[in-house]
Amino acid sequence: MKIEKFVLGPMGTNCYIAVNEENGECFLVDPAAWPQELSSHIRTRGKKPLAVLLTHGHFDHIMGLDGLLKEYDIPVYALENEKDILNSGRLNLSAMMGTEYTFSGARYAKDGQILDLGGAQIRVIHTPGHTSGGCCYYIEKEGVLFSGDTLFHASIGRTDFPTGSSSQLVRSVKERLFELPDETKVYPGHMDETSIGYEKKYNPFV
C-alpha cells in the first residue's frame, strides 16, 4: 500500500490517499478542502476511489466532501457517535468560521467494525476525547494507523471544543492506541508522521 499525503485547507489538515499499487484502487481519509486538487490527482493517475473515511466531523476534515462526491459516487464512513457533529455547524465549528457546513450522507460504522476496501482490512477504533465520536483506522497487515486529531507527533488533540474531554482522550490513547505494536506507523490529522513506539516513549501528554 502506498500512502500519499496532501496538506489542505486553512488549518493545514493532512488528507491521505491510500492506494493499492497492484490495481489502483484507493480510499481517502479526511478530505479537508480543495477537492479539485484531490480529484485531479486521482484522475490523472488512473486511480479508482472506493470510499472516504472520516476520523471525525470537524469542518477542517470534511469540507472537501461535496466537491469530491460530485466526481465520485462513493460511500463516506464515520463512527456512528459522530452523527450529531457532522450535522451541526456549531458542533463541527464551521459556524465559528463564518461558513456553516454540514454533511448528512455518511454511513455509520461501529467500534471494532472491519471495513474491507480494495483488499485492505481496516479496523475502526473509537477514540473519544477530541470529539465524542472521533475514531482511528488501523490496517494491521500494513502496520498503519490513521489517527486524525487523536494522536499527533509528541502531542494529542485539543479537548476544548464541543464534546471534547481531556480525560477521555488520554484514556483513548493509552488504552486503545498504545496497545498496538510499537512499529505501527501513525498518520495524523496535522503535522508529521510518527509511530506508536515513539509516542509511548516520548509523548509528554499521556
Tell me the role of every PLM-derived stretch.
Residues 1-45, 137-148:
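Conserved beta-strand hairpin/beta-sheet module of binuclear metal-dependent hydrolase folds
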Residues 6, 18, 113-119:
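Short acidic-hydrophobic surface loop/beta-edge motif
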Residues 6-7, 104-106, 126-128:
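Short Gly/Pro-enriched turn/cap motifs at secondary-structure boundaries
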Residues 11-12, 34, 58, 82, ...:
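A generic "binding-loop/recognition-motif" signal
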Residues 16, 107, 112-113, 135, ...:
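Residue-level detector of beta-strand structural context in well-folded domains
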Residues 28-29, 50-57, 76-79, 126-129, ...:
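Active-site neighborhood of phospho(di)ester-bond hydrolases with catalytic His/Asp-centered motifs
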Residues 33-116, 205:
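Active-site HxH/HxHxD metal-binding segment of metal-dependent hydrolases
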Residues 93, 121-206:
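Metallo-beta-lactamase
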